């Protein structure tokens, strides 16, 4: 018996789960309890956080277009993901996926994190570019672990205030 089931038609799977690939859910994990986190992420969505993944992330833009806002060597950059593009993001490159197109779909593959290996989530000041807030978590479930972290940041003006210039990060409305 195959642990993860028989092969299946992936485009059909995406169509069958399309209702989960848009707000408010936005993503669906393909397999549970494997060594890989294989997720399909849909649009539209807009994120204000930057993810610091301790391991590589693989992106395959299946439908539509998206882009990653990046912090590289202290400056902002952008990596466009056009339909059909693949991209391997190195570990610890801060990235903020932006999926402006409804109906878009991206396959994202990550490795499960070993115990003690933490993911970071950061927010930067729009006015001066300094780090406003960082939180680290032992990531077990994207669906259950992340919303409380984000809500805690959005709900606190103190957490959103830039320690360098005093500007308040607008939170989810950025």
UniProtKB/Swiss-Prot annotation:
It is an enzyme of class 1 (oxidoreductase). Fe cation 1 binds at residues 51, 57, 95. Its cofactor is Fe(2+). It comes from Cupriavidus metallidurans (strain ATCC 43123 / DSM 2839 / NBRC 102507 / CH34) (Ralstonia metallidurans). Fe cation 2 binds at residues 125, 128, 162, 165. This is 3-hydroxyanthranilate 3,4-dioxygenase. Changing residue 110 to A: Decreases KM for 3-hydroxyanthranilate 2-fold. Decreases activity 2000-fold. SUPFAM superfamilies: RmlC-like cupins. One of its GO terms (biological process) is L-tryptophan catabolic process. Gene3D superfamilies: Jelly Rolls. It comes from the Bacteria. Homodimer. Binds 2 Fe(2+) ions per subunit.
């Amino acid at each position: 018996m195959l642990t993860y089931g028989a092969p299946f038609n992936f485009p059909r799977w995406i169509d069958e789960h399309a209702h989960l690939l848009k707000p408010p859910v936005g993503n669906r994990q393909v397999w549970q309890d494997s060594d890989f986190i294989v997720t399909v992420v849909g649009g539209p969505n807009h994120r204000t956080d930057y993810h610091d993944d301790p391991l590589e992330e693989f992106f395959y833009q299946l439908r539509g277009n998206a882009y990653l806002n990046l912090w590289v060597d202290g400056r902002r950059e952008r990596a466009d993901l056009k339909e059909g593009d693949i991209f391997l993001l190195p570990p610890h490159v801060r990235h903020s996926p932006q999926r402006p197109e409804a109906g878009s779909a991206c396959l994202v593959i990550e490795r499960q994190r070993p115990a003690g290996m933490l993911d970071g989530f950061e927010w930067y000041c729009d006015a001066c570019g300094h780090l406003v807030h960082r939180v680290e978590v032992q990531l077990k479930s994207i669906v259950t672990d992340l919303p409380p972290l984000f809500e805690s940041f959005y709900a606190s003006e103190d957490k959103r205030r830039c320690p360098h210039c005093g500007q308040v990060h607008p939170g989810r409305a950025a």
